[in-house]
């Protein structure tokens, strides 16, 4: 909402202004990943299906292209790529959840579901119930057997 337009020149001006004011450009960077967050990619694919002409979605689509180029000019920024935060609010707004004050709570409960699933998995199957560190579902540990939930 703060950008207000999907014009690439205005989006670039916004990003540069945020950096000059020493404010973060939300929706970019990740502590572990060095490429675009796959969740952000999935959200953009969903946005292209359900709201490609929505003005907010057009803005973040341009932001996704412009911001990494501007952010990568700073040698202190090791990952200028989009993360999961870039599109989530826009998509929630489009489907009707327009009060942004609920977004943090909504995201928190989404994490609870993932953490809960991991705890159940590690306590009932992994390493005889001894538990394991956080793992990424995309990857399969060498000692982990392939299995599917029915």
Model regions and ranges:
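Non-transmembrane, aqueous-exposed alpha-helical and coiled segments at domain scale
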Residues: 1-150
């Amino acid at each position: 909402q703060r950008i207000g337009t999907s014009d690439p020149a205005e989006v670039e001006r916004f990003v540069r202004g945020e950096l000059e004011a020493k404010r973060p450009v939300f929706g970019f960077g990740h502590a572990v990943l060095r490429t675009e967050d796959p969740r952000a990619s999935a959200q953009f694919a969903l946005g292209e299906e359900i709201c490609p002409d929505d003005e907010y979605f057009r803005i973040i689509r341009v932001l996704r292209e412009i911001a990494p180029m501007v952010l990568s000019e700073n040698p202190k920024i090791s990952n200028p790529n989009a993360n999961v935060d870039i599109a989530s609010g826009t998509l929630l707004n489009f489907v009707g959840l327009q009060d942004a004050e609920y977004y943090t709570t909504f995201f928190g409960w989404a994490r609870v579901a993932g953490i809960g699933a991991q705890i159940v998995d590690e306590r009932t199957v992994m390493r005889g119930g001894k538990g394991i560190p956080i793992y990424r579902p995309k990857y399969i540990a060498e000692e982990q057997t392939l299995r599917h939930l029915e």
